[in-house]
Amino acid sequence: MNKTMLSVLLLSSSGFYTSQTVWAGGEYIANLPTITMQASGDNIDPLNGAFTASQGTITQEQIETRPLSRPAEVLETIPGVIVTQHSGSGKANQYFLRGFNLDHGTDFATSLDGQPLNMVTHAHGQGYTDLNFLIPELIHNIDYHKGATSVDDGDFASAGTAKIYTLHSLERPFAQVTLGNHDLLRFLGVGHIKINDGELIGAFENQSSDGPWTNPENLSKQNLFLKYFKGDEDQNTSFGLQHYQAKWDATDQIPEHLVQNGQLDRFDSLDPSDGGKSKRTALWFNRNQRADREFSQFSAYAVRSELNLFSNFTYFLDDPLRGDQFEQAEKRTLLGLKFQKGWSDRWYDKEMLNIVGSSLRYDDIDGLGLHQTQNRQRFNTIREDDVKQTTLGVWGQNQIAWQPWLRSIIGLRGDLYHFNVNSDRNENSGRKTDHILSPKFSLILGPWKNVEYYINYAYGFHSNDARGVTTKLNVDPRDENYLQPLDSVSPLVRTVNKELGLRAHLIDNLTTTLALWRLDSDSELLFIGDAGTTEPSRPSKRQGIELSNFYQLNDWVMIDIDAAWSKARFKDSSEEGDFIPGAIEKTLSAGISYKLNDQWSFGGRLRYFGPRALIEDNSVRSDSSTIVNLLASYQLNKNIFTQIELLNVLDKKVNDIEYYYASCATQDFNTGACAPGSAEREGISDKHIHPSEGRNLRFTLRYLF
């Protein structure tokens, strides 16, 4: 067995994918020191190391040349991912991928320097992923793959995984200021110092903005980041500290009929007191080692977060006098450890790589509350809980190179969950333990004529909110079944991923990937955060096709074109229909980056977000949206850098998000469906829309020291 083949084994098992640099943020070991690797400069050959077609790495250069309207849009560098918002800028974004409306993160696992960012049993929704504390200028790379195809994939990874890594070194300190429409003002300062043969990077960010909304957003955001890194490719240690805080006023979605009849402007609000405040403080530690033919990785993290979120989606449907605003609140302490070890061996003269690992996570959530409010003042508590949730994951994986053109990967993951809920109603308190096993299999064939083929079959899962696991009584006074018994739901839900794909390198500098996939879920269990109950939904299936192209035309031009089509349906038959509301169907993304010379560079992006069913019978569908963003940068001299971003260049009047449900605004009180005291008062079913911002200009001035 030659060294190149063993290198392929190590790369694929260590998470190094297409077009990824060997030194990915200094946090992850790629190959063993005794093994050579096919590479050009710092880039691994695109055909080496992948275990599925739908994986890759986003580099710092790709992020720098992409116009961004919000931090979480760095995930849109992943083919097929759409990032939207239906509320204020301090709230977690809404994500779409592979036939999923992922809500605020369910079924897409995201991490930052080893810290999991999906929150279990969250006040607003299971898997809540707030990325507003990201500083895009500090991102070194993003590793991603679709489907729960790796043994490293645990909870929330059924649709995919994104691992974000920050810089471990800084070329030059800088300070920059960004000005934009709607009183946008952002300051960012980044510096570094050498300490004991290592490097400490520090950054501070402050941002304020009112947005285009009639009711100004009054966003105030502060971010402090510190990271120390010491070591090299053989062994390295890093630890970091980050503190983030934000407060904002939100404009939630509004009924479309009130916009169409002229009673509301697209940017109006029906409850100006919506909004919130959020805090997050994180400590983390990473240690990586390799020696001869083995490697090990250890990480630990501690996170303290707080959230108070005020929302009103139905306005005056439930309470014609005080309105329907509610508060979701929590204070959380998150602790965790992760260890992974790999070693190479031979089995009947075949090169083999084995990996074992384990992770432990503990969430201690206090004051997990759902409260009825008016103008952010509580007047009733629907429920309040203290939750302690513990998760243990263990896994093992074996990879064998049977032939130069044939590799197999077999893995098994086990997860154990313990839920402990102390509710304000004893009927809804309780403890529950559950476990699940997730086998995974991949077969990699080729390359033949610069084309490599992949077969993946993997079991995954997602957990349900702990409150849904122990709830036995409906405590929502707004519901007609108030104080009626409820069935508790299964803690863990099985998913199955299947994928066939290829990765081609048919001409120089062009990488093309094609994936045909299917994902089955036993149940779309959903905890309704604004009701305090869990709604078990129906089993589902999703399938689709993804095509991605990345072309490095030369040293100064990069082009990418990605298209995805998905079909999402409930498996069982029902009179209401089998469409999954909000499920993404079609997306298209295209971009170009052009570096004219050492001074000028340009970037452009087009994003198409196709129409989708908003209710089960597909009789109501959302509109599509197409947005074009542009970026131009100019290096005036060695110290001064300028950049202009023009967002939504065509000034398209499109919506960021659309829903369909019943509500009552005061403007509707003259109708029977919304008249206070009316026996027919059930609300007006309509699309509810949250618009994208119009044309938006931003200017950045950076001084490099």
Segments (PLM) and residue ranges:
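Extracytoplasmic beta-strand/coil segments of soluble accessory domains associated
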Residues: 72, 76-119
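C-terminal beta-signal and adjacent terminal beta-strands/loops
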Residues: 63, 611-612, 634-705
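Gram-negative outer-membrane beta-barrel transporters
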Residues: 342-344, 511-521, 536-617, 700-704
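Short acidic/polar hinge/loop motifs at secondary-structure boundaries
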Residues: 116-146, 164-165
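Face-selective signature of the C-terminal outer-membrane beta-barrel domain
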Residues: 236-244, 276-424, 444, 506, ...
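N-terminal periplasmic "start-of-domain" segments of outer-membrane beta-barrel proteins
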Residues: 33-66, 91-94
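Transmembrane beta-barrel wall of Gram-negative outer-membrane proteins
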Residues: 174-208, 213-251, 274-293, 343, ...
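Membrane-embedded beta-barrel scaffold of Gram-negative outer-membrane proteins
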Residues: 288-290, 295-313, 446, 452-460, ...
